[in-house]
Every structure is written in structure tokens, then in C-alpha cells.
Amino acid sequence: PDSNVHWKVKPQAETDTDSLQLFRSDYPLKDWVDAIVPGTVFSSYVAAGLEKDPNFGDNIYQVDKTKYDRSYWYRTEFSVPASFTQEKIWLHFQGINRRGEVFLNGHRLGLLDGFMHRGKFDITALINPAGRNVLAVLVQTPQHPMANFASPTYICSGGWDWIPYVPGLNSGITDKVFLSNSGPVTLEDPWIR
């Protein structure tokens, strides 16, 4: 995945039993919304023209927030770059908010749980190096009324009298998603004291 990848988004409740099929490369996406990545679920719906621009008038107050305060699937397909000739292939997430369950080709890679959480997965054994790969992320919004109090630095992101509450609590794939390639050993985040 990189800037050339086309993401789609849809509420989990609307995929119903199809969620078992969405990992197939021939899965129909005609009623899915084009997703903005990096971005939020709500910003994708605004960009698609399904919500009015929240920056004008009282549009933000007219949004049915229950529509966004629920789980959403993000989905894309990608191929491995021909330049990847080293042993290991890594999938990087620079930010998912608030909670994201990551699947590649139907296999669960893991859970990223936190505000703008980052993650890295070794996908070498699961990747289809010669064909299409399906990446799906189930982004979940906290379902309790004090959700933003879990992180004191995040409290002022919305919901006070001076800034309206953002539908979905800014949930989505909020930063870059990309692949990298390495040899069998890597050194990351060295710190010398």
C-alpha cells in the first residue's frame, strides 16, 4: 500500500455476513465509499459528497452522529513492488484511531489499540508476491461516553463548548500505510545513552 492504492470504506453492520467474503479479490465494492487515507471515516463521507462540509454554518450539528459512532471496514488491494528483492516484507501503519483490527488475505495480523496507534507486521509468509493482495482493517470507535478521557492529551479534540464533537471521534486510518522490504535482521529505533 502506498499513495497509489485506492481504499474503500463501509460500515461493518452493512457488510453483514459478507465480512467473511470481503477478503476475496473478486469481492464487489460498488456500494462502498471511496476512502480518504490518511483521514477519518467522516472525512471520507464528506469528500464523497454524502455529508455537507462541516466547516460551514451549523452543518456539523446536523450530522447523524450515530452513523459514525460505530465500526467500519476499510479495504484495499495491492501488489508487491518488483523492486522488493530482499527476504522480508513488512506492512507499516503510521496511525490508526482508535482501534484497528488488521487482516491480510483473510489472515488476522493483529490489533492496533490506541490513539493514532502505529504498528508494523511481518507479512512475508502471507503475501502473494506475484498477484493481488487484499488488506482489510476493521476500525472501531470506543463505545463509552468518556472515550476521549482515556488520553488526557486527546481530550481537547472535540466535544467542548468551543469545538463541536466530531462524528466517530476521529476514527479511521489517520496516517500513512506502506510496505517495506529488508533482509532477515533489522535494527530500529536505536537509543544510546
What would you call each of these model-derived segments?
Residues K10-E14, A48, D69-D189:
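Accessory beta-strand-rich segments of carbohydrate-active enzymes
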Residues S3, T17-S19, P54, N59:
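Coil residues (strongly favoring Ser/Thr
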Residues V9-K10, E14, Q21-L50:
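Predominantly extracellular/luminal regions of secreted and cell-surface proteins
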Residues V5, K30-V33, D175, E188:
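A short, local hydrophobic-aromatic micro-motif
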Residues S43-T66:
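Surface-exposed, low-complexity/disordered Ser/Thr/Gly/Pro/Asn-rich loops and linkers
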Residues W191-R193:
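Short beta-strand segments of immunoglobulin-like
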Residues P1-P11:
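Extracellular carbohydrate-recognition regions
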